[in-house]
Regions:
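A short amphipathic alpha-helical interaction element
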Residues: 220-259, 270-275
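N-terminal nucleophile
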Residues: 2-226
Length: 275
């Protein structure tokens, strides 16, 4: 087998109600997240793999931005590529349409599957079960897009995965102004570049990401009544702080602090743990 093949399995998907597009990927390849996943809010997502053509990422997004469908985008990318027989690509467009392409010279097992709002594909797999697990898990799960993508990735590995083993994994999710301080479109961008169990490590990082940058719905915040306010002041004093915002900033929880009439239960939990 020639060097340079991005032997992998991936799923590209969207949550139109949330305005999110994303890609999850795992491979026996160093730093797969630097090559395979591409996404842009309002345009779509692309996964480029096998003997990956990295240009499929930006060029695919440009086509999607113009209003091309997922299938039209795949057709245009592969038609212009003399190496298409070795390429594999999955695309989801702005309307949730999906398309996947597997070149005739991709190493077995190789193939893909599409459904409402997702494209799943892989090459050099133990069997087709991996792609089926990606698709069926995505269809069967609910909740945030990032969590559905991670669940699909784990199911793909449990079904066999890349027949060469594991090395790296990545998760990319975009949403307009959904990123840090609402000044970025990158909601989640996590990469495990070299690890014996990259999917488990990616799941661990996602949990940390949600702690630091996740958002508890405001209606689940706890009112700062007299008793709770006194507890918070006491906890802060014990740590040497007067302001919850000051402590949260140093604890990397400032995205979860807003006003002084209520407190995010995650912040309260971490404050109690810090005492």
């Amino acid at each position: 087998m020639a060097d340079g093949v991005v032997a992998t399995y991936s799923i590209v998907a969207c949550d139109l109600a949330a305005g999110q597009w994303g890609v999850a990927v795992q491979s026996k390849f160093l730093a797969v997240g630097s090559v395979v996943p591409w996404a842009e809010p309002g345009a779509g997502g692309v996964a480029t793999q096998s003997y990956a053509n990295p240009r499929y990422g930006p060029e695919g997004l440009a086509l999607l931005r113009q209003g091309r469908s997922a299938q039209e985008t795949v057709d245009a990318l592969t038609a212009a590529d003399d190496g298409r027989a070795q390429r594999q690509v999955g695309v989801v467009d702005a309307k949730g349409g999906a398309a996947t392409f597997t070149g005739a010279e991709c190493h077995d097992w190789a193939g893909g599957r599409t459904g409402a709002g997702y494209a799943a594909q892989g090459n050099i797999l133990v069997s087709a079960d991996t792609v089926d697990a990606l698709a069926e898990t995505f269809e069967a799960t609910s909740g945030p897009l990032a969590e559905r993508l991670l669940a699909s990735l784990a199911a793909g590995q449990a079904a066999g995965g890349d027949r060469r083993g594991q090395q790296s994994a990545a998760l990319l999710v975009v949403e307009r102004d959904g990123g840090y301080a609402m000044l970025s479109d990158t909601l989640v961008d996590l990469r495990i570049d070299d690890h014996e169990r990259p999917i488990e490590e990616l799941q661990r990082l996602y949990e940390a990401h949600e702690l630091l940058f996740g958002k508890t719905p405001r209606d689940r915040w706890l009112p700062l009544d007299e008793e709770l306010r006194a507890e918070v002041r006491g906890l802060l004093a014990g740590l040497g702080y007067e302001s919850l915002a000051d402590w949260a900033g140093l604890a990397n929880l400032k995205e979860r602090v807003d006003g002084d009439d209520a407190i995010d239960p995650v912040v309260l939990r971490e404050l109690r743990r810090a005492k």
